[in-house]
A protein has these predicted regions:
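OB-fold nucleic-acid-binding modules
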Residues: 1-35, 39-65, 69-221
Length: 221
């Protein structure tokens, strides 16, 4: 994965070599946590594959092991993270791959293994951990977000939620957690007791944040 990252030296770079990566899908749209993309982590790091489609999880299940053929695709940089997709046709660094074309690049290897997350403290999270699948333990919601829900309600449409940043701390440092307004638990109350959060280190709105993956793995401690 590090070699692939090194190729993304420009805003968008065409991959001309035969490069394959094998890893686990550690984030997708199963719970609405990441739309129109999947994150593949090979144990050394991750990359976000942009996809044009809905219900991606039905084709590429969360935590499945996959092989991605990178030749012919483009790498791009979105802040501190590396993304991959089709050659860009507009202002984006890469375009999304159509669902109909996805399996020309992506092969399912195994659907029966769950990847191990890397256990980190908040202080260990930086750009070098971008798109890694991680677990952070003994986290506490900040005082001024107690009794809130994971996402704020959209004032223009009270039936929908907005993508929201929440904050957790470990007594020493504070972690930003980005929660997609489309996630299945957007309207649920935030945990009031210490907990563990599992997810990917992501880049959101110009900063590093944790994006929860597979919400049912949040553990009260």
């Amino acid at each position: 994965m590090a070699y692939l990252w090194s190729l993304a030296a420009e805003r968008s770079t065409k991959i001309k070599r035969d490069i394959y990566i094998v890893g686990h899908v550690v984030a997708n749209d199963k719970f609405g946590e990441l739309g129109k993309a999947i994150v593949i982590d090979d144990g050394s790091g991750g990359i976000e594959l942009k996809i044009e489609g809905e219900d991606i999880n039905s084709v590429v299940p969360l935590f499945s092991r996959v092989m991605l053929r990178c030749s012919g695709l483009n790498l791009g940089r979105e802040g501190a993270k590396t993304v991959i997709g089709r050659a860009p046709t507009a202002e984006y660094v890469v375009d999304r791959i159509d669902m109909d074309d996805l399996l020309n690049y992506l092969t399912l290897v195994d659907c029966n293994t769950v990847p191990e997350s890397e256990r980190l403290t908040i202080s260990a999270i930086d750009s070098h951990k971008m798109l890694h699948y991680v677990t952070l333990s003994n986290l506490q919601l900040v005082d001024n977000e107690q009794e809130m829900t994971w996402c704020d309600v959209d004032p223009q449409n009270r039936q929908e939620h907005l993508t929201t940043i929440r904050h957790f701390h470990d007594l020493c440092d504070t972690l930003c957690v980005v929660v997609d307004g489309a996630c299945h638990y957007a309207g649920e109350k935030l945990p009031t007791h210490p907990c563990s959060l599992h997810g990917i280190v992501d880049w959101h709105d110009g900063d590093i944040a944790l994006r929860i993956s597979a919400y049912q793995l949040v553990e009260q401690q």
